[in-house]
Structure formats: C-alpha cells, structure tokens
Regions:
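Canonical P-loop GTPase G-domain recognition
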Residues: 5, 22-25, 168-207, 214-220, ...
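Flexible, charged surface loops at secondary-structure boundaries
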Residues: 136-138, 232-235
Length: 287
C-alpha cells in the first residue's frame, strides 16, 4: 500500500469515528499519524527531480502571492494592479513561471507575485505544485483568486496549502518543547486544556520524543499540538478575491456571496472594483 492509500485509509477512519470524550485520544493519534504521512508525501515530492524550482528575490515592504486554479484571472489582475507583463490566456497553465509586479499604494511598496495555478494534488507535487508552494511559504500575504463560477476551489486550495504545512489566518500555538536526556515527558500549562496530558505524551512519542518538558500557554487542540511538535509550519494571513463577476447573473453572484461574504468581488478584465483590492491587500498587510 502506498502513502496516498495510507492517507485515505486514515482519513476514512477519522471520518467514521464519532468524536466524543471516549474517542478523542484515538482520533488524536490518528491525526498524528495522518500528519506524518502527509509530511512524508511533501518530502517525497520535494526530493524528486524534474524542475529547478522558482527563485524569487523578495523586494519592497511586503510580498503578496496570488493563489488560484489555472485561468481564474490572476495574470489579468496582476497586470491591472501593477502593469507587470504576465501572459494572459483563457486556457490552463498560461503562467509557467513566477511573474513579479510592484504595487505602490499609500506610501507602501508591495511586491505581488503571479504563480502558476494550483490544482488538487499540488502538495504532493502535481502541476508544479512543489515549486509554487515554496513561493507561497515565503510570502507575507496569500490572496486567493476564485472564479465566480467555481468558488468551490477555495476549499481545495486551502486544503492543499494545509497539507503542505501552511496555516492561514492562524497564529502559531504558544507551545515550548524542551528536549531532555532523561525523565520522560512532563507537561505544564497556564490554563485548562482541551487535550489531555496522556494525548500530549502519546503524540510526542509518535514523533520519537520520549524525554522532554512541554509548556503550553494556549488552549490548543490536537492539530495545533502536532503543528508545534513538527515545527515546520508557516503562518500567513490570507484574503479572498472573487473574479469574473461581470459574467455572472444575479443568482450565481448571490449564491457566491452567501458562501464567501467576506470576499472582495471584482472583474479584473473590466477593471471593476480594483481599488477595493488594493485596500484589501494594504489592510491585510497591517502596515
């Protein structure tokens, strides 16, 4: 059985197991195993040949990456916002490299990167996903670009980034793990915890940590504990822009806004509401 089959098996067991106090420990161990398997997939994809990756020199006060499926309008938006020359076409994978542009706004110099479209399976290397994700990991803000007719892409994109160790709109859990030579695992916290001390010890043992003192200053869940143990997560703010609204009828637009009320709705091609995108980016970067 391969890694992907192992992942599917663990995911299915998690789905089938009702969550309650009696099963929380078992589910926590399953999530720990799932995180290890996903990390193996990402590492395996990273170790494969076939591509030099992308080398992007960061510039300006902050770097923003436009993330979306192929042909959702990322290149058009970059061109309209910055005047950069990213090839535009109504077919998939028009952008085969990272195209940088610069937005000067409210006395800030913001680098905006147009990367090749992400697709399902990107975290495991599909569609140059490995190279694209390496760029995303180093940016200061993710701007999701969705097609108004295919807004379900948002869930796929966030899951791919999650599987690649990118945590969006979250803060790093306040957990300190101090390894020791002996003494087993001791756990202390500054508040009552959602997770049990036994589960904390079990997760650390899963990652071959058998002697350590763990100090927890947040009421974390098991996913956040796993993130803290793995130590290779990045935490990036994210916002959402829905494009091609000029092509949508009232019903489609209404349904999309019900699903994504916080998104900014635009037509990059018709240059509709682009000032709102500039404000969105500037505010999210919290200058």
């Amino acid at each position: 059985m391969g890694l992907h089959e192992d992942i599917q098996e663990v995911e299915e067991e998690i789905r089938k197991t009702p969550y309650n106090k009696a099963t929380s420990h078992h589910i926590g161990r399953l999530k720990s195993k799932l995180a290890r398997l996903r990390d193996e997939v990402v590492k395996k994809a990273s170790s494969k040949g076939g591509g030099e990756g992308y080398s992007v020199r960061k510039s300006g006060d902050a770097t923003v990456t436009l993330v979306g499926f192929p042909s959702v309008g990322k290149s058009t938006l970059l061109n309209k916002l910055t005047g950069a020359e990213s090839e535009v076409g109504a077919y998939e994978f028009t952008t085969l490299d990272v195209i940088p542009g610069v937005l000067e706004y409210n006395n800030a110099t913001i680098q905006i990167l147009d990367v090749p479209g992400l697709v399902k399976g990107a975290a495991s290397g599909r569609g140059r996903g490995r190279e694209v994700i390496s760029v995303v990991r180093n940016c200061d803000l993710v701007v999701f670009i969705l097609d108004v007719f295919q807004n379900y892409h948002h869930e796929v994109l966030t899951q791919e980034l999650y599987d690649a160790g990118i945590r969006l709109n979250q803060k790093s859990p306040d957990v300190v793990i101090k390894r020791q030579d002996r003494g087993g695992i001791t756990v202390s916290s500054t508040m009552d915890l959602e997770i049990s001390e036994d589960l904390v010890k079990a997760v650390l043992n899963d990652y071959k940590i058998h002697n350590a003192h763990v100090l927890i200053r947040d009421n974390i869940n098991v996913d956040q504990l796993i993130d803290a143990v793995m130590g290779n997560r990045v935490y990036i703010p994210a916002v959402t822009v829905v494009n091609k609204v000029d092509m949508a009828d009232e019903f489609v637009l209404k349904k999309c806004k019900e699903g994504y009320p916080e998104a900014t709705y635009i037509s990059a091609d018709k240059e509709q509401n682009l000032e709102a995108v500039k404000d969105l980016i500037y505010d999210a970067l919290d200058f």
